[in-house]
UniProtKB/Swiss-Prot annotation:
GO terms for biological process: intracellular protein transmembrane transport; protein import; protein targeting; protein transport by the Sec complex. It is an enzyme of class 7 (translocase). Monomer and homodimer. Part of the essential Sec protein translocation apparatus which comprises SecA, SecYEG and auxiliary proteins SecDF. Other proteins may also be involved. It comes from Lactobacillus acidophilus (strain ATCC 700396 / NCK56 / N2 / NCFM). Keywords: ATP-binding, Cell membrane, Cytoplasm, Membrane, Nucleotide-binding, Protein transport, Translocase, Translocation, Transport. Disulfide bonds: none annotated. Its EC number is 7.4.2.8. Part of the Sec protein translocase complex. Interacts with the SecYEG preprotein conducting channel. Has a central role in coupling the hydrolysis of ATP to the transfer of proteins into and across the cell membrane, serving as an ATP-driven molecular motor driving the stepwise translocation of polypeptide chains across the membrane. This is Protein translocase subunit SecA. The gene is secA. PANTHER family: CHLOROPLAST PROTEIN-TRANSPORTING ATPASE (PTHR30612:SF0), SECA INNER MEMBRANE COMPONENT OF SEC PROTEIN SECRETION SYSTEM (PTHR30612). It is found in: Cell membrane; Cytoplasm. NCBIfam families: PRK09200.1, PRK12904.1, secA. CDD domains: DEXDc_SecA, SF2_C_secA.
Length: 799
C-alpha cells in the first residue's frame, strides 16, 4: 500500500513538473499579450485556427492560447488567472482531473483549456451538476469566449430540438450531465438524421467530476414508455410483507431455525425471505411453490415490497410531497425531480405510503454515466475532493487526479472528532457549540447526512431561538442564495450532504477576525470525500476557519461498521456514564477505517456495474451503429435486406426439413411461406413432395427478387422505395431492441441466483446476454422478412 501511495505521489510530482514548464511559457507571453490592442488580441483566434489547419497541434499552441485567454479574462471579466490556475488549466487540457480546493477559482481555471480546445471547432462541453450552474457559468464566462470570437451555447431541458442543435453546434456548450446523456439516447431513437441534435462527442470538462463520475456512476439514464401494470399486484404484495417479522439472528448462529420471515444484510442493503417467509407467502397466496415459473411476477412484486418497506427509508431515501414519492439523492441531499426508481420499486414505495400508484415504465433506451462519458475523445474534470477516489478515476476513466497547489497557505483548523454515546447527547452538544459561536457573531455551517437530521436540528435551534436557514432536498430553489449568505456575520446554515456545491461561501465584513466560517459535521458520511467537501467550505483562499465532526454510537456508519469496537473503547476510557465524551485521533482513525471499507465496497459495486453494463454497451454500439447506417443511407437498402431475408429463409427451411423427407414438417413449412413470404396461391404451386431443399430455397429467393421488382415498379420513385425500406427496418429494430433491453434487465435481476450453483454470475450474464442478442438479431431478420414481403405498398409512409 505504501508503495502505491508513493507511486501516486511521484506521478503527481512528475506531472506538475511537466505542467510547470508549460506554465512558465504561458507567463512568458504575458507582457506581449498585454501590449496588444483589443482588436489585435481578438485577431489571435482566427490566427490560431489557421495554424491548426496548417498542422500545428493544440499542445504547440497551448502557451500562446492560454496567454490570450488569460489576458482576455483580465479585460472582460476583471479576473487574471494565478499561476496555480494556469497549472490547473494545463492539467485539464491533458485529460486529467484537477483537484483544486474550494475558492481556488475552478470556473476561471477552465476558461483556458476551453478556449484552446474550442479552436478546433469540434465542440467543447462544459458539464455541471445542475441547470442553475450551467446558466450562471454560460452567462459569466460566455462573455469572455464571445469577446474572443467563439460561439457559446446553453443546453437545458426545456429547449426544443432546434434550440438544442444550435447550442451543440457552438464552439463551447454548457450543459448538465443528465441532459447530455438523454440527448445522446434521444439522438439514437430518431428516425431522420435531421432530428439529431448532438455532434460527435469531442472534449468535455466536468465540474464537480466526483459527483458525476463516482456518486452517480451507477445511476442509469433511462428513457421510458408506459407499460401496462395492475396496481392491485403491488397492493397485495405490500399488505403481505407488512405482516412479516425480521430475522435478527446472527448469520453464524448454531441452530438452523429461522427466527423471522425475512433477513436484511445492512452492509450490502440486501433483503430476502427466509424459509419461514416463503412458507407464509405460499399460504397467503394459496400456492404450492412460490418460485414456480407462473409465479415469477408475484415473486418480483414481493421482492420490491420487501425493499420498499424495510430497506428504503422515508425522509432519507425519498420524501413524500403532495401525494407523490420523490427520490432524494443520497450524496447531494437534493430531490431528484422527474426521477423514478425503475423495475417497480417506485410503485412498491407508493403502495407502502398509500399514495396513488403511477404506471410502471418500460425502458426504451438506457446508458450509465460511466459508459456515456467514456465515449468522449478527451475527458477531464475539476473537483475539490478527488484524491480519495484516484484509483477508480484511473482504472475506469484513465484519468489521473492531480492535486493543484493552493494560491495561499491553508489557515483552517481541522479538529479531531468528538464521540458521544447517544444521538441526544450529541445533538445537545452541537446546539451548545452553535450557541457559543453564534453569540460572538461567528457564522456556522452545520452539515447533516439526512433530511431527518437537518429537520431535528432546525427544531432544536428554533427552541434555542437561534435564527437559521435550512438547505436540503425539500428546499433547494433558493439554494445558491442561502449558501452565498452562509459566510455573513451571525449566519447559521444547516446543509444536507453539502447541497449547494458550486457556489462559494465568501466571508462577510469582520468575520475573519472572529475565526472565519465554523463548520460542524453532525455525522460522518460513508464517503470521506463528502466529509472533505463539507470541510472545504471553510478556509477558502487562505481564510481562517474551523471544522469539527460530532459523532455518536447511534450514527448509521457506527452501527454498520465497527460500532462495538468503539463502544468497548468508550467503556474502557470512562467509568462515569454521563460523561462519556471522547475527543481522540484514534476515534477519527477508526471512523476513517470504516469509511475506507465502505468506499472499497462501493468501488467494487461500481466496477461490477460497469462490467455488467459493458455487455449492454457493446450491444448498444452495434444496434445504434447499424441503425445510423440505415438512417443515413441515400440509396436502396436492397443489399442489406436481401441477405437478411435469405438468412431467415435458410434457417426456417433447415428447421422444418431435418432428417429424411418423411420427417419434414410440411404444414409448418407451408405456414411459414404463406404467412411470411408469398401468397397462398404461390405456396400451393410448390410441389413439396418432390422438391429438394436447395431447389426450394432457390425458388423462395426468386420469389423475394420478384417481390422487390414489383414493389419498385409500384412505387416508381427510388426515393419512395428507400423510404419504405427504412420504415420496415427501423420499426422492427426499435421494437425488438426495446424488448431486448427489458429482457436484459430481467436477466440482470435474476442472474445473482445462479451464483448459488457455483457459477460466476458475470460470466453467466455475458453468455446469456450474447445468446439473447443473437436471438434478437434472428427475430429482427424474421420480422423484417415478414413485414417487407407482406406489407402493402403505400405512398407517404411515415417512419
Amino acid at each position: 500500500m505504501a508503495n502505491i501511495l508513493k507511486k501516486l505521489y511521484n506521478t503527481d510530482k512528475r506531472e506538475l513538473k511537466k505542467f510547470e514548464k508549460y506554465a512558465t511559457k504561458v507567463e512568458e507571453h504575458a507582457d506581449e499579450m498585454s501590449k496588444l490592442s483589443d482588436e489585435q488580441l481578438q485577431a489571435k483566434t482566427p490566427e490560431f485556427r489557421e495554424r491548426i489547419k496548417n498542422g500545428e497541434s493544440l499542445d504547440d499552441l497551448l502557451p500562446e492560447a492560454f496567454a490570450v485567454a488569460r489576458e482576455g479574462a483580465k479585460r472582460v471579466l476583471g479576473l487574471y488567472p494565478f499561476h496555480v490556475q494556469i497549472l490547473g488549466g494545463i492539467a485539464l487540457h491533458f485529460g486529467n482531473i484537477a483537484e483544486m480546493m474550494t475558492g481556488e477559482g475552478k470556473t476561471l481555471t477552465a476558461t483556458m483549456p476551453v478556449y484552446l480546445n474550442a479552436l478546433e471547432g469540434k465542440g467543447v462541453h462544459v458539464v455541471t451538476v445542475n441547470e442553475y450552474l450551467s446558466s450562471r457559468d454560460e452567462e459569466e464566462m460566455g462573455q469572455l469566449y464571445r469577446w474572443l470570437g467563439l460561439t457559446v451555447g446553453l443546453n437545458i431541458n426545456s429547449m426544443s430540438p432546434d434550440e438544442k442543435r444550435e447550442a451543440y453546434n457552438c464552439d463551447v456548450t454548457y450543459s448538465t450531465n443528465s441532459e447530455l446523456g438523454f440527448d445522446y439516447l434521444r439522438d439514437n431513437m430518431v428516425v431522420y438524421k435531421e432530428q439529431m441534435v448532438q455532434r460527435p462527442l469531442n472534449y468535455a470538462i466536468i465540474d464537480e467530476v466526483d459527483s458525476i463520475l463516482i456518486d452517480e456512476a451507477r445511476t442509469p439514464l433511462i428513457i421510458s414508455g408506459e407499460a401496462e401494470q395492475a396496481n392491485s399486484d403491488y397492493i397485495r404484495a405490500d399488505r403481505f410483507v407488512k405482516t412479516l417479522t425480521e430475522d435478527k439472528s446472527d448469520d453464524d448462529a448454531d441452530d438452523d431455525e429461522d427466527h423471522g420471515d425475512y433477513k436484511i444484510d445492512w452492509p450490502t442493503k440486501t433483503i430476502s425471505l427466509t424459509r419461514t417467509g416463503i412458507e407464509k407467502a405460499c399460504e397467503h397466496f394459496g400456492l404450492k411453490n412460490l418460485y414456480d415459473v407462473e409465479n415469477q411476477k408475484l415473486v418480483h412484486h414481493i421482492d420490491q415490497a420487501l425493499r420498499a418497506n424495510y430497506i428504503m427509508l422515508k425522509d432519507i431515501d425519498y420524501v413524500v410531497q403532495d401525494g407523490e414519492v420523490l427520490i432524494v439523492d443520497s450524496f447531494t441531499g437534493r430531490v431528484m425531480e422527474g426521477r423514478r426508481y425503475s423495475d417497480g420499486l417506485h410503485q412498491a414505495i407508493e403502495a407502502k405510503e398509500g399514495v396513488k400508484i403511477q404506471e410502471e415504465s418500460r425502458t426504451q433506451a438506457t446508458i450509465t454515466y460511466q459508459n456515456f462519458f467514456r465515449m468522449y475523445k478527451k475527458l477531464s474534470g475539476m473537483t475539490g475532493t478527488g484524491k480519495t477516489e484516484e484509483e477508480e478515476f484511473r482504472e475506469i476513466y484513465n484519468m489521473q487526479v492531480i492535486t493543484i497547489p493552493t494560491n495561499r497557505p491553508i489557515a483552517r483548523k481541522d479538529m479531531p472528532d468528538i464521540l458521544y454515546p447517544t444521538l441526544d447527547s450529541k445533538f445537545h452538544a452541537v446546539i451548545e457549540e452553535i450557541k457559543k459561536r453564534h453569540a460572538k457573531g461567528q457564522p456556522v455551517l452545520v452539515g447533516t447526512v439526512a433530511i431527518e437530521s437537518s429537520e431535528r436540528l432546525s427544531h432544536l435551534l428554533d427552541e434555542a431561538n437561534i435564527p437559521h436557514a435550512v438547505l436540503n432536498a425539500k428546499n433547494h430553489a433558493k439554494e445558491a442564495q442561502i449558501i452565498m449568505n452562509a459566510g455573513q456575520r451571525g449566519a447559521v446554515t444547516i446543509a444536507t450532504n453539502m447541497a449547494g456545491r458550486g457556489t462559494d461561501i465568501k466571508l462577510g465584513p469582520g468575520v475573519k477576525e472572529l475565526g472565519g466560517l465554523a463548520v460542524i459535521g453532525t455525522e460522518r458520511h460513508e464517503s470521506r470525500r463528502i466529509d472533505n467537501q463539507l470541510r472545504g467550505r471553510s478556509g477558502r483562499q487562505g481564510d481562517p476557519g474551523y471544522t469539527r465532526f460530532y459523532l455518536s454510537l447511534e450514527d448509521d456508519l457506527m452501527k454498520r461498521f465497527g460500532g462495538d469496537r468503539v463502544k468497548d473503547f468508550l467503556d474502557r476510557l470512562s467509568d462515569n456514564d454521563d460523561e462519556k465524551v471522547i475527543e481522540s485521533r484514534l476515534i477519527t482513525r477508526q471512523v476513517e477505517s470504516a469509511q475506507k471499507r465502505v468506499e472499497g465496497n462501493n468501488y467494487d459495486t461500481r466496477k461490477q456495474t460497469l462490467q455488467y453494463d459493458d455487455v449492454m454497451r457493446i450491444q448498444r454500439e452495434i444496434i445504434y451503429g447499424e441503425r445510423m447506417q440505415v438512417i443515413e443511407a441515400d440509396k436502396s437498402l436492397k443489399n442489406v435486406l436481401i441477405p437478411m431475408i435469405h438468412r431467415t429463409i435458410n434457417s426456417q427451411v433447415d428447421m422444418f426439413t431435418q432428417g429424411d423427407r418423411s420427417q419434414w414438417r410440411l404444414d409448418s413449412l407451408r405456414d411459414f411461406i404463406s404467412s411470411s413470404l408469398a401468397s397462398e396461391q404461390v405456396t400451393d404451386s410448390i410441389d413439396f413432395k418432390t422438391i429438394s431443399v436447395e431447389d426450394l430455397k432457390k425458388k423462395l429467393y426468386d420469389i423475394v427478387e420478384k417481390n422487390f421488382e414489383d414493389k419498385e415498379k409500384a412505387l416508381g420513385d427510388p426515393s419512395q422505395m428507400l423510404e419504405f425500406e427504412k420504415v420496415v427496418i427501423l420499426r422492427v429494430v426499435d421494437d425488438r431492441w426495446t424488448d431486448h433491453i427489458d429482457a436484459m434487465d430481467q436477466l440482470r435481476q435474476s442472474i445473482g441466483l445462479r451464483g448459488y450453483g457455483q457459477l460466476n454470475p458475470l460470466v453467466e450474464y455475458q453468455d446469456s446476454g450474447y445468446r439473447m442478442f443473437e436471438e434478437m438479431i434472428s427475430n429482427i431478420e424474421f420480422d423484417v422478412t415478414r413485414l417487407f414481403m407482406k406489407a402493402e405498398i403505400r405512398q407517404n409512409l411515415s417512419r
